[in-house]
Amino acid sequence: MALIGKSERFSADFVMGGAAAIVAKSAAAPIERVKLLLQNQGEMIKTGHLIRPYTGLGNCFTRIYREEGVLSFWRGNQANVIRYFPTQASNFAFKGYFKNLLGCSKEKDGYLKWFAGNVASGSAAGATTSLFLYHLDYARTRLGTDAKECSVNGKRQFKGMIDVYRKTLSSDGIKGLYRGFGVSIVGITLYRGMYFGMYDTIKPIVLVGSLEGNFLASFLLGWSITTSAGVIAYPFDTLRRRMMLTSGQPVKYRNTIHALREILKSEGFYALYRGVTANMLLGVAGAGVLAGYDQLHQIAYKHWVQ
């Protein structure tokens, strides 16, 4: 067991994390597309790719259905699944790797150091994964915000994921695929640190006794953590996606501070939180990933022990 422990554990974490993510993200794809449109409508109106603003969650759902059809709720989902499988699976796997690397133990190092180790391992996992896979998130964002209601020529900007890469590389080069990457690392580090760190820290305190191994309890804990982390990190997500949408446009934000100033000046503070309600609903999918991964983890290691 000692010889195969590390390599098999890394592989199992990778596969189980990705499998849980694919199911949850595909189910939540309609909500995620609504969130992207609400969050980025200011930029879309500015560039002429949206005629009038969405007034809320219900209005956005209605207009997508009426103007684009049911299947359009899954527009960009292919890119999302391609992105999310390696992203989520790598996050779980790298989290375990960094956690073992730091080697913090609650019994040996005390609660505070153990908590800090959990937060650090979650943050490092998110940052490492993003370095390799950010361009896929860019493609997903561009497809998700590509509304049919366009005042430029009445057509969509992109035919599909390959077209996103082709047009972006042609107009902006590799840099265009990584626009907003800097602020993304800050936001992801904050979000993943809370997402993984708090879950790993609170789980052994809350999920004990009759609640140990309980899917509903694990799900509710995961939902509360993903919602809290998502709300805190949301402005960073808005900034990076707004910067993404300027690739291929004649006028771009010079940097994150410039983007923040321009958005606050023209749209106000609330613009940083547009779509946050939909994002909270997406926390249900995130909680499902955490709870599902936890259940798969228990089943797999029980099998290994036997």
From Swiss-Prot:
It is a multi-pass membrane protein. Residues 240-245 are annotated as: Important for transport activity. The keyword Transmembrane applies. Its main location: endoplasmic reticulum. GO terms for cellular component: endoplasmic reticulum membrane; mitochondrial inner membrane. A motif (Nucleotide carrier signature motif) lies at residues 240-245. Coiled coil: none annotated. Disruption phenotype: Dramatic growth retardation. InterPro entries: ADT_euk_type, Mit_carrier, Mitochondrial_sb/sol_carrier, Mt_carrier_dom_sf. Solcar repeats lie at residues 8-101, 113-205, 213-299. PROSITE patterns: SOLCAR. Gene3D superfamilies: Mitochondrial carrier domain. Keywords: Antiport, Endoplasmic reticulum, Membrane, Repeat, Transmembrane, Transmembrane helix, Transport. ADP binds at R83, K95, R240. It holds the Pfam family Mito_carr. The chain crosses the membrane at residues 10-37, 78-102, 111-131, 181-202, 216-236, 276-296. SUPFAM superfamilies: Mitochondrial carrier. The transmembrane helices are not perpendicular to the plane of the membrane, but cross the membrane at an angle. At least 2 of the odd-numbered transmembrane helices exhibit a sharp kink, due to the presence of a conserved proline residue. ADP:ATP antiporter that catalyzes the exchange of ADP and ATP across the endoplasmic reticulum membrane. Belongs to the mitochondrial carrier (TC 2.A.29) family. This is ADP,ATP carrier protein ER-ANT1.
